[in-house]
């Protein structure tokens, strides 16, 4: 099964036109690798909007499991 994850830049609306297609059960680390291979090494935290979080946005760590149509904003060190 596949899920759609959308990215968001700080101060800008989410980019719903160009999402990432990933397997169900992937973590924030997998999303970082899909964006850029060195992004996971520079990862500080992520803000996630969607059904995988209790609050919108919620600050999550690298092991957070993403769900379909989540929006992620990655903050680097």
Give the positions of each predicted feature:
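C-terminal-of-GTPase-core extension/linker across diverse P-loop GTPases
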Residues: 1-77
């Amino acid at each position: 099964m596949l899920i759609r994850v959308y990215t968001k830049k700080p101060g800008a609306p989410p980019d719903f036109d160009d999402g990432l297609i990933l397997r169900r059960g992937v973590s924030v680390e997998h999303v970082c690798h899909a964006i850029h291979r060195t992004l996971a090494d520079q990862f500080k935290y992520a803000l996630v909007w969607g059904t995988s979080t209790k609050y919108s946005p919620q600050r999550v760590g690298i092991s957070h499991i993403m769900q379909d149509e989540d929006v992620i904003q990655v903050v680097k060190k």
